[in-house]
């Protein structure tokens, strides 16, 4: 591990330790306030405003700035809540906790013999999906974008394992990760994928009426294994409080034209995610370069 890797890991550990010393609500509020203040000053805020301008042109510039501030605040809350995930995953009537909607759809997919693919997006607190699926009895793994610093990657992975109550496989995006995810599904495992990030090697399908390079692996896996794609998204109800919602499965077509079927399934996934984002735009990660630069 390099000096910079060790230094950054120690810094992240110290920050998370500070949040861990607070209550879940206090940590969430503090993280949100910090990022709401500094996020709009960061270069990636220009990406967020540009994305909003193209995706939601019917809104005013002031509304775009407001949504961008909300997105920064949500990101700060997500980071601060990482150390409090075990408590957040408790099903409570109020305060920190999680509400489940249509959980029978999740349970059925987790308990079914064939593999299943759960897709979601960077909405509200996306770190909830896999740990909650494991707590519900699923043998889940996930595809993720690994941080550049291996020490930070290991630290975040340990926090995710603590939230789930046990270790689970995470497959870095890329060729080897894709092959390992395929093997996990072939062995009867379940896979969670966040489908809203740009993949330069992906396929171009519409997202907010603009071509967006999108990973086709989930569609290809579903077609290969003839397994359902389960839409699941998270909504923020307050500091450290969430609702996880499952929707009817996306069943893979069987036209015999694999390339066409992959396009159809991937476009449907983007359409579903777009609906989630339009409903709660302040909870999405607008500062990501989702579309090609113009």
Regions found by a protein language model. Name each.
Residues 1-120, 157-159:
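Membrane-anchoring hydrophobic helices of lipid-metabolizing enzymes
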Residues 3-4, 58, 65-69, 108-111, ...:
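Non-catalytic C-terminal accessory region of glycerolipid acyltransferases
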Residues 14, 47, 104, 128, ...:
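Short Gly/charged-rich anion-binding patches and loops
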Residues 46, 103-104, 123, 146, ...:
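Alpha-helix N-cap/helix-start capping motif
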Residues 92-98, 166-173, 207-209, 255:
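Short, flexible loop segments at the rims of nucleotide/cofactor-binding pockets, characterized by
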Residues 96-99, 123, 149, 171-175, ...:
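A conditional alpha-helix N-cap/helix-loop micro-motif detector
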Residues 101-103, 143-145, 171-175, 247-249, ...:
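Conserved beta-strand termini and adjacent loop/short-helix elements that scaffold enzyme active sites
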Residues 112-174, 200-205, 236:
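Catalytic core of membrane glycerolipid acyltransferases/transacylases, capturing the structured
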């Amino acid at each position: 591990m390099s000096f910079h890797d060790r230094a950054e890991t120690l810094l992240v550990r110290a920050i998370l330790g500070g949040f861990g010393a607070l209550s879940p609500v206090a940590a969430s509020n503090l993280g949100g306030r910090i990022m709401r203040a500094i996020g709009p000053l960061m270069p990636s805020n220009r990406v967020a405003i540009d994305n909003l301008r193209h995706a939601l042109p019917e809104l005013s510039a002031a509304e775009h700035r407001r949504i961008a501030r909300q997105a920064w605040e949500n990101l700060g809350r997500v980071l601060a809540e990482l150390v409090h995930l075990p408590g957040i995953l408790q099903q409570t009537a109020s305060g920190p906790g999680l509400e489940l909607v249509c959980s029978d759809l999740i349970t059925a997919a987790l308990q079914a013999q064939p593999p299943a693919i759960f897709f979601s997006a960077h909405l509200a607190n996306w770190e909830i999906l896999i740990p909650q699926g494991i707590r519900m009895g699923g043998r889940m793994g996930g595809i993720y974008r690994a941080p550049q610093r291996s020490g930070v990657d290991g630290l975040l992975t340990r926090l995710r394992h603590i939230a789930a109550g046990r270790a689970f496989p995470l497959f870095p995006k890329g060729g080897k990760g894709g092959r390992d995810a395929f093997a996990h599904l072939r062995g009867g495992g379940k896979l969670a994928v966040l489908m809203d990030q740009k993949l330069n090697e992906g396929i171009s399908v519409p997202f907010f009426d603009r071509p967006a390079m999108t990973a086709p692996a989930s569609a290809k896996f579903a077609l290969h294994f003839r397994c359902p794609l389960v839409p699941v998204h998270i909504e923020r109800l307050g500091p450290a409080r969430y609702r996880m919602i499952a929707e009817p499965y996306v069943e893979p077509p069987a036209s015999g034209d694999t390339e066409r079927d992959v396009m159809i399934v991937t476009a449907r996934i983007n359409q579903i995610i777009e609906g989630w984002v339009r409903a709660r735009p302040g909870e999405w990660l607008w500062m990501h370069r989702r579309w090609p630069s113009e």
